[in-house]
Amino acid sequence: MKDKSIKVLEFNKIQEILKNYTCTKAAKDIIEDLKPYDSMYEVREHLEETKEAFKLLITKGAPPFEGVYDIRSGISLAEKGSALLPGQLLKIAAVLRCARRFKEYINHKEEEESYRVLENICEGIFSLPKIEEEIFNAIEGEDEIADRASSTLYNIRRSLKEKNYSVRDKINSLVRSYSSYLQENIYTVRGDRYVLPVKAEHKGAVPGLVHDQSSTGATLFIEPMSLVNLNNEIKELMLKEKAEIERILTVLSAKINANITGVKTDANIVWELDFIFAKAKFASEYNCTCPTINDEGIVDIIEGRHPLIDRREVVPISVKLGEEFTSLMITGPNTGGKTVTLKTVGLIHLMAMSGLMIPARENSVISYFNNVFADIGDEQSIEQSLSTFSSHMKNIVEIMDKADENSLVLFDELGAGTDPTEGAALAISILENLRKRGTKIIATTHYSELKAYALRKEGVENASVEFDVETLRPTYRLLIGIPGKSNAFEISKRLGLPDYIIDFARENISNENIRFEELIQNLQEKSIKAQEDARLAENLKLERDKEKKKYEEKLEGLQKVRDNALIDARREAKNIIKEAKEEADKILKDIRQLERMGYSSDARRKLEEERKKLKDKLDSIEEKEIKTVHKGEALKNVKEGDEVLLASINQKVIVLSKPDNKGDVLVQAGIMKITANIKDLRAAKGSNSNNSSSKIKKSKKLNLNLRRVESSVDLRGMDAEEAIYTVDKYLDEAYLGGLGEVTIVHGKGTGVLRKTIMDMLKGHSHVKKYRLGEYGEGGTGVTVVELK
């Protein structure tokens, strides 16, 4: 495919729009390299993946792309064996989670529609939940490791917390002792060591090590000698903490390295899915459909719209090519939409051949072409000193060298820019040469000679863009089969040019040309009328199909009601039979036990007789239960407002009309109005379901949730709505499980999720109080909740 044609048809602008629907830089890079595929098989497969993603968006909503990142730099470092930063590990885990969730998102029940192409793509996902879980368990945020990352880290931080408490107690005591020598009665920290702000003139009064001074020199920050050992211990613990964190990051990075193939594969699949769903989102936004693809040169675009024109203003066009004719000559006034038609056809083909759904109606047909050539617009080059004609001819020469039967060629104003007679002759020669090769052609022109060429040459068809002489405006509608009529005289007259000048001009045109223009006008009027009639017929057909579908759905609903009623009756009868038989068998078992103990067998024989009678009676219950649907007092007449039983569905209905001469009446069953015959109506005596159900005692069983409840819940990656639901459910379980204190992990981020959770906790019935985590607990990335 020629890059020049892709540029002229503005496919690059479609790529830029597509990028707006992606989540990752990697998917944007895929779109940047997007071009028409090299085979019809590839085109069909990529269109199918777009179509499947489009259906998933409709049926299942947004795909699970929350928190997906471009992790190529992190993968590269892990591949080299480097230790990754906490943020890099978190992003890798997020991508792994997305891949795993996508397999769940795309899964479908046996009776549901499958998604062949997307399922094949997702089959390649490794799913590494263990690594994903370890990373999320160990890392709280971009720069914070969780206490639970290792027992060693937990112990270090616990010791660190205890030492900090000790040193704070000690230094608070020193503040009180040295208060007269201090600038303020506080302590502070310099270089991870606790110090006192001592007035410079009293430095000798506080023995210790000077760590810093204020900008004015009036204050010295002195570490009292009695704190040196405690501060040293804190410093040692902090160094141990740092070393343990580095060890944890190294271990996690090594696990990524050991599974680098799976990580890379999952990441690449996620980015590919990001690209595919960007295509689907574009299709949804621009009301696109999936065309039928062929390699026979057949084109049938139904109400195609140029995607770069404002959707409120664009006028749909319908274009056919390749069956009855292989060349289409479009004529009409300037700014009438001829060039837009060419660009629409060309761009729609590039989109379809790149796996994109197209902005056209259902059942549109696109042909796979090896090449799409476009000579459109004035590309005159000042640097090359080329005229408009020369510039176009340079393009045409290149097209003539490469075009074949598998090419689509788009010419704008072919032969323009030179003497009209020579230009028209040259244009006809070029078109005829390409036509004989089997090339599919759409060309715009002003030349009458090309209109005549299309009329007399088999396989070539005229078309025109409609022009409203009354308003002096183009309608932008394309009329196939009708050459464009010159409107110069009509336009000039409406703009005020004197009649005598127009009449004199008419006298200088041959009678043959006048008759030709009149014939064109007559054909154009008839074509417009025929198209209007066709549109009206299509609308009537759509309306009829809509009504038919509505009544078919009503009929199906009634059938379901009837079937469900019969099923319920059978189920109820079976339950009665089952319970009665079980009771009888239990009594017989007891009698046999009595016999073994020496009691008379008379009771057993009598009970056997009763049991047989009961069995005979119960065996007919199911049939009787179902037959009751059709029994009841027959009705000879009904009136409006009567409540009766509709036997066919065993449901009470309200009579809405008197019987007609056929005995049909209109009745209301629930929210539906249906027609029934009076023979199918019975006198309503009350609900059978209530009576039967009252005879059956149903046992209830209390299910206790005895599973272990975790002491924390992780909300990272969730949106606000999902997080609120998860926390509410978790607090119920924790409360019932007898937990006194729990931790909610929401991460630091922008703080929106944290605020949402805190707002929810304020009025929660199980919450006694809550606070943000302290150092070592997760800081502002967690909320600690005390339960009632």
Curated annotation (Swiss-Prot):
Alphabetized UniProt keyword annotations: ATP-binding, DNA-binding, Endonuclease, Hydrolase, Nuclease, Nucleotide-binding, RNA-binding, rRNA-binding
Top enzyme class: hydrolase
One MF term in the entry's GO annotations: ATP hydrolysis activity
One of the protein's GO biological processes: negative regulation of DNA recombination
Domain of life: Bacteria
Pfam families according to UniProt: MSSS, MutS_V, Smr
Occurrences of domain Smr (ranges): 713-788
Residues that bind ATP: 332-339
Enzyme Commission numbers on file: 3.1.-.-, 3.6.4.-
Annotated family: Belongs to the DNA mismatch repair MutS family. MutS2 subfamily.
Function: Endonuclease that is involved in the suppression of homologous recombination and thus may have a key role in the control of bacterial genetic diversity.
PANTHER family membership: OS10G0509000 PROTEIN, OS10G0509000 PROTEIN-RELATED
Name of the molecule in the record: Endonuclease MutS2
Taxonomy of the source species: Bacteria, Bacillati, Bacillota, Clostridia, Eubacteriales
